[in-house]
Amino acid sequence: MNISMSYRFALWAIAIALASCAAGLQAATDSPAVQAAEALQPKAKPPFVIPTDAAARGKLVAEVREYMQRAPAEVRAHPAAADFPGVLAPNTPRVTRTVTVSGDRKRWQSTGLYANAGEVVTVTPATALPAGVSIEIIIGCHTDSLLGDKQTEWKRFPLLSRKFTLGPAATPVANAFGGPIFAAVRGNTGKAGFSLDLRLANAAEAPFFVLGKTTPAQWAAIRNAPAPWGELVGHNMILHFPASQVRQMDDPTPLLEWWDKVVAAEDHLVGWPERTEQERVVPDRQISAGWMHSGYPFMCYLASAPMITDLKKLRTDGDWGFFHELGHNHQSPAWTFAGQTEVTVNFFSLYCMETVCGKPTGTGHGAIKDLDALLKKRFADPPEMGPFEQLGPFIVLIRKFGWAPLQATLASYQSAPAAPKSSVEERQAEFIRRYSKNAKADLSAFFKLMGYACPDSLRGELKSLPAFDFAAWRAQMGTAKP
């Protein structure tokens, strides 16, 4: 080793020692909560097993919450951020960009930018906000909290997303885990729309495609952007994926158009007007409940991400589970009664399987393949009341009368909502009334067989309509009596 190399090596060793010393001093001044949170580094394998002792668990939860509330200037990258959701590669360029926020939207508005773990991004509004209106800056799309009592282990840090209220001037924001950056308008209900430019400094570009706006040339340039997560924005649906998956897509247009069609079909079934804001799907290493769950964002596991993009399979087979969870975002208590949350939601799966994927009416899931068996169980004494057994009678109505009466019935609640504070019995009777009138048939006896409240007054009101003869229908369909 020559002198020059020895000198450089010595300088490097000194720098490492100084950095280690500084890190040690910083760690020594951290609160016990911060030290405990940074020592918590769960992975997919092995996961972190949550203490079963209530006091120990409560202490850990409090430490995690405190850690994720640190002021931006105090935030540094968590040691587990590189494992999930990922960090920027060394020497990744940072950019300053201006994005426009629309004041008449309530949900997240995408920026196409990414905050690296532990780094401060400065957000500056171009002008003052209208009175009573605020803007929330969100860093991180993985919003599921894993701090709930039902969790027994963590495969990633239990909180990953942070929110900040934008100030009148430059506002620093930071997240120990980084993430895509979003803006959300708060408090503008009933006020006129507006637009506001936001300047974001020290962010990184993400693979970001907007249907109808991003050109092939632009996509070729941005698909390899350095952020670890990418985003595909449709008219009705926004899809988040690990960037490695997004970069494989030569043209996201057909995929987004297909998902837009799915959301539009579900909107149509309940009579929603043309939407101005999208649903949003985020795959995660670990979610708070189930294999997927509804909400905003709609959450699923990373294992489901390839299914979301397999357009060939989606076009032919659909995806009952995705249709189902999106359906939860469309359900209403006006026509979903106790024990039916996992029943009426499958109207949407059935509808998409038929209208989007071309499946025969009342098919698309193995559990409903044998309708006769379902009906025998549903109308047995005592009845089986599983979600598919309860779905069976609705499949009967759809096969008999088509989708139009059910669609008209669900849509009618948009223009004529159920009476406020009405009882379950009153709401059930109202549903029977609307469905019967739209089907142009008296369905009261059939719904009474299903256990719905059906007062004599309603039966008298519907007696001018031809009665639906369920027994005759079953005989005609070649099914046996229960």
Sequence positions of predicted segments:
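Bacterial N-terminal signal peptides that target proteins for export
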Residues: 2-12
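Bacterial N-terminal signal peptides
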Residues: 10-20
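Beta/coil-rich, acidic/histidine-enriched accessory regions frequently appended to metallopeptidases
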Residues: 28-36, 54, 66-67, 71-74, ...
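Activation corresponds to long, low-complexity, non-globular regions
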Residues: 28-76, 235-241
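Beta-strand-enriched, solvent-exposed domains that form extended recognition/catalytic surfaces
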Residues: 66-204
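Exposed low-complexity, polar/acidic, P/S/T/G-rich flexible segments that act as propeptides
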Residues: 187-232
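Catalytic cores of extracellular degradative/oxidative enzymes
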Residues: 219-220, 225-400, 408-409
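Active-site-proximal alpha-helical
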Residues: 371-459, 467-470
